[in-house]
Amino acid sequence: MLDQQTINIIKATVPVLKEHGVTITTTFYKNLFAKHPEVRPLFDMGRQESLEQPKALAMTVLAAAQNIENLPAILPAVKKIAVKHCQAGVAAAHYPIVGQELLGAIKEVLGDAATDDILDAWGKAYGVIADVFIQVEADLYAQAVE
């Protein structure tokens, strides 16, 4: 789990996510597709162009930050998203790429306001959240095989 300092930093970024979340996630997707074009087929590009997907991701990241001390509270949303991930063919191997590009987008959008402490905290938080998604998706993939 996350240490208290990390939790405090994540909670302190909630107002920033409310203000800049969609810009961060739009930048994230732009960079993800430019640097990792192999993941493009996993995404509905119409939802990208309409900003529906960046808005949805921004809301998910915000919900995770708001519930960082009680991540089980977002498990119902995680399960719904995981079903979509499994339908699209998302694999555990994609999560490190996503984490790298998400942190890069935070830095790109926030500039110097994205301190090393903030980026480190979000790196740790992303790791915990990604592990939850990976486990839920592994369970779904296993059920599909049965």
Curated annotation (Swiss-Prot):
Q: Which GO terms describe its molecular function?
A: FAD binding; heme binding; metal ion binding; nitric oxide dioxygenase NAD(P)H activity; oxygen binding; oxygen carrier activity
- Record Gene3D superfamilies: Globins
Q: Name one Pfam family in it.
A: Globin
Write the record's keywords in alphabetical order, separated by commas: Heme, Iron, Metal-binding, Oxygen transport, Transport
Domain (Globin) ranges: 1-138
Q: Which GO terms describe its biological process?
A: cellular response to nitrosative stress; nitric oxide catabolic process
Residues the entry annotates as binding heme b: Q53, H85
Keyword RNA-binding among record annotations: no
Q: Does the keyword Metal-binding apply?
A: yes
Superkingdom of origin: Bacteria
Q: Its function?
A: This protein functions as a terminal oxidase.
Q: Which family does it belong to?
A: Belongs to the globin family.
User: Which PANTHER family does this entry report, sorted A to Z?
Assistant: FLAVOHEMOPROTEIN
Q: How does it assemble?
A: Homodimer.
Q: What is the protein name for this chain?
A: Bacterial hemoglobin
